[in-house]
Swiss-Prot record:
Catalyzes the initial step of the lipid cycle reactions in the biosynthesis of the cell wall peptidoglycan: transfers peptidoglycan precursor phospho-MurNAc-pentapeptide from UDP-MurNAc-pentapeptide onto the lipid carrier undecaprenyl phosphate, yielding undecaprenyl-pyrophosphoryl-MurNAc-pentapeptide, known as lipid I. CDD domains: GT_MraY. Belongs to the glycosyltransferase 4 family. MraY subfamily. It is found in: Cell membrane. Keywords: Cell cycle, Cell division, Cell membrane, Cell shape, Cell wall biogenesis/degradation, Magnesium, Membrane, Metal-binding, Peptidoglycan synthesis, Transferase, Transmembrane, Transmembrane helix. Its EC number is 2.7.8.13. It is a multi-pass membrane protein. Its cofactor is Mg(2+). GO terms for cellular component: plasma membrane. This is Phospho-N-acetylmuramoyl-pentapeptide-transferase. It catalyses: UDP-N-acetyl-alpha-D-muramoyl-L-alanyl-gamma-D-glutamyl-L-lysyl-D-alanyl-D-alanine + di-trans,octa-cis-undecaprenyl phosphate = Mur2Ac(oyl-L-Ala-gamma-D-Glu-L-Lys-D-Ala-D-Ala)-di-trans,octa-cis-undecaprenyl diphosphate + UMP. The chain crosses the membrane at residues 3-23, 53-73, 78-98, 118-138, 143-163, 174-194, 200-220, 226-246, 251-271, 316-336.
Length: 336
């Protein structure tokens, strides 16, 4: 526990100290910044804001985790666990970095195409499974204490879980500070679970990432001076999925990650309903003012027809939802 606290403090200090230099470098080199969605007019002023800040906090968290773990790793099993989680973080971070690089440095608005990104994510998921999950012999899902054996189909579950939540966190990263603190809330919850399970190696990784994210948040809260980019959001989503698998509490991510699930579901529902109504009535109709869900809240509150919410209001609401959901999971696991 002491080493986890040390890792968190070091990560916070290095991340908070390094980020201004990253932002200044970005501005001095006059690198193109984040593109804004024209439908949310209050976001247009953010155009050109430095992005790819996730590069900094990922490097910091990874380096600190490896450094501090040298004093805590006692066996090869612990080393395999740490390397497994860090590997998926690095792989998905590289995918996100490539996507950001194409958008910003090569001026390719789309970045990686959807098919290219999915192919790379699946390849990363396969590497994670065959190098770190399969050797452990895990082939079942723990659902409320019951082991649901999937056999070879556990491979498809892992791919769905990692790819799905990496994209879900990516969708959540749409307004200042939302994704960074939402992930911190999720990581704190998994930190409690790891502590109860005496999985101190996982706890150390969690602590390092929490510290690095809080250092990043010092510059990502409204008005944001930097965004994490796909390099950060894709890696964070994959990390949450990997941690839920490592702790054998996969189902909990559906509740702990309720904000990411809500954001993704809103997009899927909107697209499906629009296509259905266009085919049936000749015109596409919408359920939400705009998706992902945080934009719906910005444009008209919960109903979509009320007063516009500020980014701080949206943040507070969704952070609150995530916190309550996380407390519910802890209550289910350790109280009821």
């Amino acid at each position: 526990m002491f080493l986890t606290l040390i890792a968190a403090i070091i990560s916070f200090m290095v991340s908070a100290f390094t980020m201004p230099y990253f932002i200044k470098f970005y501005q001095l080199k006059k690198i193109g910044g984040q593109q804004m969605h024209e439908d949310v007019k209050q976001h247009l002023a953010k155009a050109g804001t430095p992005t790819m800040g996730g590069t900094v906090f990922l490097l910091v968290a990874t380096a600190v985790s490896l450094l501090v773990s040298l004093f805590s790793i006692k066996n090869t099993q612990s080393l395999a666990l740490i390397s497994g989680i860090l590997s998926i973080v690095v792989i998905y971070g590289i995918i996100g970095f490539l996507d950001d690089f194409l958008k910003i440095f090569k001026q390719i608005n789309e970045g990686l195409t959807a098919k290219q990104k999915l192919a790379l994510q699946l390849a990363g998921g396969l590497m994670f499974y065959f190098l770190h999950v399969s050797p452990s012999g895990i082939s079942s899902i723990n659902v409320f204490g019951y082991q649901l054996s999937l056999g070879i189909f556990y491979l498809f579950f892992v791919l769905f879980w990692v790819v799905g939540f990496s994209n879900a966190v990516n969708l959540t990263d749409g307004i200042d500070g939302l994704a960074s603190i939402s992930v911190v809330i999720s990581l704190v919850t998994y930190g409690v679970i790891a502590y109860v399970q005496s999985q101190f190696d996982v706890l150390l990784l969690i602590g390092a990432m929490i510290g690095a994210l809080l250092g990043f948040f010092c510059f990502n809260h409204k008005p944001a001076k930097v965004f994490m980019g796909d390099v950060g959001s894709l890696a964070l989503g994959a990390m949450l999925a990997a941690i839920s698998i490592a702790l054998r509490q996969e189902w909990t991510l559906l509740i702990i990650g309720i904000v990411y699930v809500l954001e993704t579901s809103s997009v899927m529902l909107q697209v499906s309903y629009f296509k259905y109504t266009k085919k049936k009535y000749g015109e596409g109709r919408r359920i939400f003012r705009m998706t992902p869900f945080h934009h719906h809240l910005e444009l008209g509150g919960l109903s979509g027809k009320g007063k516009k919410w500020s980014e701080w209001q949206v943040d507070a609401f969704l952070w609150g939802v995530g916190s309550l959901a996380s407390l519910l999971v802890l209550a289910i696991l350790y109280v009821f």
